[in-house]
Each structure stands twice: as C-alpha cells, then as structure tokens.
C-alpha cells in the first residue's frame, strides 16, 4: 500500500502486531529521550488504576533495542505496582526515521484528542449496556443504547 500524500510505502503491521506481542520486565526497558515532559503523578495514578482495573490489557510499543516508543506512563505505573511482566509490541521493522515519524505523529495526535463529560458519559452508558448483556448471558453486544 502506498501513502497518497507522500508516496512512501506504508508498512503492513498486521503480522508484526498479531504474532509478535512479547512480554518484558518493565526494568529491562529503556526510555527514548523525548522533548515532551514526563507524565504527572496524577497521570501515573490513572495509569496504575487502569492497569489494576483491567489487568494491564494494553500493550506498550518498543523498538528493536527495547526502548519504549509508546507507553512510558504505563511502564512507570507497572513498575510502581511491582508488575513483573508487561505486554509489548516490538516495531523491529521500523527504521530510525520511521520511529521518529511515528513518535511525532503520536505526540501530535495526543494533542488533538480531547474528552468531554458528554463523551465519557456516552462511553460509560455503552459499557453498562454491554455488561448487562454479558451478565444476562446474551452474546449480542451490538444492541442499541436507548
């Protein structure tokens, strides 16, 4: 697949993502130097709560040298919780330029993403419907929210 705007090849991450999720000791991972500030204590607390509540379900992203590309806050939270292993997706096929572009894109994307109370309420209501359906033994989690 070719990127329409730049003409560059878009990597196919399907195989890499689905087949190569690995587990790392958080202390084996290194941080890439970033110009952006570190996460606040409040943000780390939120990461810890999410890991605790959802069993750390979201993998981090690492490069071929085990540098954290995405998920610094989750790694720090896992360390503070004393977690021995966390899931990671290695982007070993990325060049240095690819990684720089990926990180820049993720930082820019993060700056544009915002949440409102209304968005959170809608998400919560959807999750409550799914939970109720699952408890009722119905596998149909696509029901419309009233």
Where do the protein language model's features map onto the residues?
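Short, charged/polar connector segments at secondary-structure boundaries
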Residues: 1-92, 99-146
């Amino acid at each position: 697949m070719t990127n329409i705007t730049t003409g560059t090849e878009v990597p196919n991450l399907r195989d890499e993502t689905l087949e190569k999720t690995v587990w790392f000791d958080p202390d084996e991972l290194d941080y890439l130097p970033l110009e952006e500030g570190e996460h606040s204590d409040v943000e780390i607390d939120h990461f810890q709560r999410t890991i605790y509540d959802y069993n750390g379900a979201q993998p981090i992203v690492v490069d071929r040298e085990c540098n954290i590309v995405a998920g610094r806050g989750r790694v720090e939270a896992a360390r503070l919780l004393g977690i021995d292993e966390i899931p990671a997706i290695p982007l070993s096929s990325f060049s240095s330029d690819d990684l720089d572009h990926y990180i820049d894109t993720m930082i820019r994307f993060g700056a544009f993403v915002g949440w409102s109370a209304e968005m959170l309420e809608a998400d919560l209501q959807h999750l409550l419907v799914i939970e109720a359906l699952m408890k009722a033994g119905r596998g149909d989690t696509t029901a419309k929210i009233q």
